[in-house]
UniProtKB/Swiss-Prot annotation:
PANTHER family the UniProt entry points to: ATP BINDING PROTEIN-RELATED, SF3 HELICASE DOMAIN-CONTAINING PROTEIN
Protein name, per record: Putative helicase 184R
Region (Disordered): 506-528
The organism of origin for this protein: Invertebrate iridescent virus 6
InterPro entries in the cross-refs: AEP_C962R, Helicase_SF3_DNA-vir, P-loop_NTPase, Phage/plasmid_primase_P4_C, PriCT_2, Viral_Helicase-Primase_Cplx
Tree of life domain: Viruses
Length: 971
């Protein structure tokens, strides 16, 4: 299959985007570009014709042909001698096809497009019976027969097939009792629908391909028309064309089958065969269906001037945006929201097509297809509007945009010099007079650039909204620039009057030097006398000079900024900023975790904090930076299972919230990499990470409305919160743990300067991490507390020298040479960049698995390594150890003379714990033991004496007096 791979592009070269996956000896994912389709199918067809084994599968897109997998298998005693007819008969296949055709006819929406008989044609594909011995010791076999149904002329939305259509069809199949002979031959009775699988979301083997090993490909056994009558292959595809555009014939149709049966053909082919379902006949898993909002408010239809502005702004966008799918789609969804929100959808789609046509990849039907999907969801993404277009245009073509916006605001066009400014332009020229007019012009020119509210002033820097200490320092230059743009018109205005004066016979200037005498009978221009035109020009010049005074003097500037503040101010800005859990900002853009897309930041993201590193889209698993980072973490976690778990758990750090409600406790002796690991994470997060004081989790939670400044630091999108350096005798509050690791209710806090009524409602975005050598005990834990805790052991040790340690000992004890470069700022930053990229890749795979599980109605959980479970269980045992020891050894007494001196029982406690916990050692020192025991027994904290307490009578006495002599010190 070497020649086939030469045509395809390895997915790793284009950031993982792929259309095909190899299921044979050569593993990998690949991308087929449209401009190489003809070459690919020719090479693939020739390889198939020459008998080469092929193992390529296609990745399904958002729209797929209706595909059905019928999986017949059963267990038999003795080697079977089966043929196809022993499994099913033709009537079974015909009945199943008929059920699907009827279901399509009843449930497909016919309003937009007519459903024809051709759309109902079904290709039946089969492969030979496969026999597999269960094990060598028994003479039992599994017999399998695979059948695929493929409707090549009918494309449908993938998720609707899974969520709405297949459940309905399966019900119909059970009612018809198909495959009854096969079911009756089985030991266990099953429902017919259990034989039918929906594979719309799975990779689909190309025609002629098979999996590795002895597997054979599926072949066409028959094709059924809309009446379930057999037709020839050439008749089925008669109206199609070959990959080179020539017509399908009896002689070439076999060669073209891999292309004709592709589940991911050209967008133009999908568009012609695409249908949508009516409203689902059965509401299944409503939470999984797309949210549809058919009542979106519209602002009223755009004026023709605004539509032209939309098209003009789109024309300023860079061609590179049209070549990059993510940016191309962002432009599309922006125009879609403008079009549907302002009742100019047709014009918005036209603007998108004009923009897209600049790319060599342009396919008009692809625009129609994507637009139809946006319309079906009818859900604006971050409510992108004209401001987003302006921002993108400003990034791509700032000079042209500035000239255009200025000309638009002045109500003149194409002014580049005095020659372009004629009398008509002077009459149309708008010069703002009042503060409100100037402010409106400023806001229009700087749309979505400034923001003001209860959090202060912000300016959009291209990625996030940056907080401004002094808004005047930023606005004043813009106001001055606005006035100078008008002042630059004065020479052109004067040129007009000068030209008229030179043309006027007997002209004499007035005393003012600007106008004409009242009795001037000069020539006319455009129906007006020279005097009238000069008067008009002078009035415009006066207005411009007045504007300049307001924009360039401090007092009027302050007044203007106050008006601008009122115009762009947003109430409760705190409720908007940093509230999207799916967005995380890097220094060079924003990653959208819901779409697995890295893109340019937009004003409507409302992000005010970003990480300190860029997201490097050029990284691959073979990049030296990534290899170095992985080598570092594999020394931290030499155990492969522990390494994978650490990555799977922490790839969630970028998404806001703690949806799995996990508290990670990193523990281990010193010099094992905990601090360096956390330093890498904190360094890349910057202001998105906080360090909580220990008292926040060891003390009681504050009362409602009380001052709690520590928690207020964790608002505004903070993703990472750490508590470290616990003392051995400190105890953590279980209630605080549950509050901070995510629950139904938000957290409430008040900063030092805030009034009680200004309490902040905090939706925690952070993951909570404890870092400690000795794990603190938990006060009054319940099952909900323990279910949240994951103790992650850092097993390695990093030493300054390992010369005297054998290689065997190093490997066994996980000892490594300490690399001091990991403490250097540049190394930490480099590791952070690679780590950030790698975790995003892990997150994508994990999230896709989570979504697939949700669609199938299953729960999703990652496997917890045995070492984490053991460490967590040991911690739990230690947390309950005092109470268990107390209950095992002691009992309450009514006699005041019954006393217990806790100092004497520490060694007995250690022995008891070892005996009751499989010889494990408890991580509780004597001081901590005495304190916890006295607390539990309600004894005297000064003397460590507990009254009305005695040993249980069933226990044998032991010699406490001689403990010290026997090497068991009391202190």
């Amino acid at each position: 299959m070497t020649d086939v791979f030469k045509v395809l592009t390895p997915a790793k070269n284009i950031n993982g985007e792929h259309t095909h996956v190899s299921m044979g000896d050569t593993k990998g994912t690949w991308y087929l570009s449209l401009n190489k389709s003809q070459e690919f199918y020719n090479v693939y067809g020739l390889a198939l014709k020459n008998g080469q084994k092929l193992s390529l599968a296609e990745k399904p897109g958002e729209y797929v042909p209706l595909l059905v997998d019928i999986d017949l298998k059963k267990e038999v005693n003795g080697y079977p001698n089966y043929g196809s007819n022993d499994f099913y008969n033709d009537e079974d296949i015909i009945n199943v096809v008929k059920i699907f055709q009827n279901a399509v006819s009843e449930n497909v929406n016919r309003h937009a497009k007519k459903l024809t008989n051709k759309n109902l044609r079904c290709v039946v594909l089969e492969k030979d019976i496969f026999i597999e011995r269960i094990n060598e010791s028994e003479d039992k076999y599994i017999v399998k027969k695979g059948i695929h149904l493929h409707f090549p002329h009918l494309f449908l939305p993938k998720k609707d097939i899974k969520n709405s259509f297949m459940p309905v069809v399966k019900t119909m199949i059970d009612q018809e009792n198909v495959f009854q002979d096969f079911i009756n031959s089985m030991d266990n009775q099953i429902m017919p629908s259990s034989l039918i699988d929906d594979i719309s979301s799975k990779y689909w083997l190309m025609y002629g391909s098979s999996k590795e090993g002895l597997n054979k490909p599926y072949k066409i056994s028959k094709i059924l028309d809309h009446n379930q009558q057999e037709i020839s292959i050439s008749k089925c595809f008669k109206s199609e064309t070959c990959i080179d555009g020539s017509p399908i014939t009896d002689t070439n149709v076999e060669f073209e089958l891999p292309m004709l049966l592709s589940i991911n053909p050209k967008p133009s082919i999908i568009s012609n065969k695409l249908f949508y379902f009516k409203e689902a006949p059965v509401k299944l898993c409503d939470a999984l269906l797309p949210v549809v909002n058919n009542n979106r408010e519209k602002e009223g239809r755009m004026s023709s001037r605004e539509i032209e502005k939309m098209k003009k702004l789109t024309s300023f966008l860079s061609v590179s945006r049209a070549d990059d799918y993510n940016q191309w789609w962002t432009v599309g969804i922006t125009l879609f929201n403008i079009g549907t929100g302002r009742d100019c959808e047709e014009e918005a789609l036209e603007a998108w097509k004009m923009f897209s046509s600049q790319s060599t990849k342009y396919d008009e039907s692809r625009c129609d297809l994507e637009w139809a999907e946006m319309k079906k969801k009818n859900r604006p993404l971050n409510a992108r509007t004209m401001g987003s277009l302006i921002f993108m245009a400003k990034s791509d073509n700032p000079v042209a945009l500035e000239k255009y916006l200025l000309a638009e605001q002045m109500n003149i066009e194409n002014w580049t010099s005095h020659q372009n400014l004629d009398v008509e332009s002077i009459k149309k020229l708008k010069v703002p007079v009042f503060d409100t007019e100037i402010a409106e012009m400023f806001v229009s020119q700087h749309e979505d650039e400034y923001l003001n509210g209860n959090l202060g002033w912000f300016k959009f820097n291209g990625t996030i909204w940056s907080s401004l200490e002094s808004v005047g320092r930023h606005m004043r230059p813009s106001l001055v620039s606005l006035s100078r743009s008008y002042l630059n018109l004065i020479p052109a205005l004067k040129y007009i009057t000068k030209t008229l004066q030179n043309d006027d016979e007997g002209y004499e200037p007035s005393d003012s030097g600007f106008g004409f005498d009242d009795d001037d009978s000069a020539s006319t221009s455009g129906g007006k006398t020279t005097a009238e035109i000069t008067k008009l020009v002078n009035s415009k010049i006066k207005l411009i000079n007045d504007l300049a005074k307001k924009c360039q003097n401090n007092g009027p500037q302050m007044s203007l900024m106050k008006v601008i503040e009122d115009m762009i101010g947003i109430d409760n800005l705190n409720d908007k900023m940093d509230q999207n859990k799916q967005l995380i900002a890097f220094t060079n853009g924003v990653y959208d975790l819901s779409l697995f897309t890295f893109r340019q930041g937009l004003p409507e993201d409302y992000i005010t904090r970003q990480m300190t590193i860029p997201y490097d889209i050029t990284l691959t698993m073979e990049n030296p930076k990534v290899i170095k980072m992985l080598n570092f973490f594999k020394k931290i976690f030499p155990d492969e299972e522990l390494f994978e778990y650490f990555m799977l758990e922490n790839c969630e750090m970028y998404i806001g919230g703690n949806r799995d409600k996990i508290l990670q406790i990193w523990t281990g002796e010193g010099d094992n990499g905990k601090s360096v690991t956390n330093k890498i994470i904190e360094n890349k997060f910057g202001k998105l990470s906080v360090k909580f004081p220990k008292g926040m989790v060891t003390g009681d939670p504050p009362k409602a409305g009380a001052c709690f400044p520590e928690l207020t630091r964790a608002q505004r999108g903070v993703r990472w919160a750490v508590v470290d350096e616990f003392a051995p005798d400190e105890t953590v509050n279980a209630g605080v743990i549950k509050n901070l690791t995510g629950g139904i209710d938000n957290l409430y806090a008040r900063d030092i300067q805030q009034k009680g009524k200004d309490v902040i409602d905090i939706d925690p975005f952070f993951k909570l991490i404890f870092i400690c050598n000795t794990i603190p005990n938990i006060r009054n834990p319940d099952n909900a507390t323990w279910n949240r805790i994951r103790v992650i052991p850092f097993e390695s040790t990093f030493k300054d020298s390992i010369d005297d340690i054998s290689l065997e000992e190093q490997k066994r004890d996980k000892i490594f040479l300490k690399d001091t470069s990991f403490c250097e700022k540049e190394t930490i930053r480099e590791l952070g960049e690679a780590f950030a990229w790698y975790l995003i890749q892990v997150f994508i795979k994990k999230e896709q698995a989570r979504r697939d599980a949700r669609l199938n109605g299953k729960s999703f959980k990652i496997k917890i390594p045995a070492k984490v479970n053991e460490a967590t269980e040991l911690y739990k045992a230690q947390g309950n150890a005092i109470a268990d020891y107390f209950n095992d050894k002691f009992e309450i007494s009514d006699d005041d003379n019954d006393t217990i001196n806790i100092k004497l029982y520490y060694q007995d406690f250690l022995l008891w714990f070892s005996q009751t916990h499989s010889n494990k050692n408890v991580n509780i020192d004597k001081k901590k033991f005495m304190k916890l025991f006295v607390q539990h027994a309600k004894g005297d904290m000064n003397t460590f004496i507990c009254t009305k307490l005695k040993l249980k009578e069933t226990l044998e006495e032991f010699n406490l007096e001689n403990n010290e002599e026997n090497g068991m010190p009391l202190f």
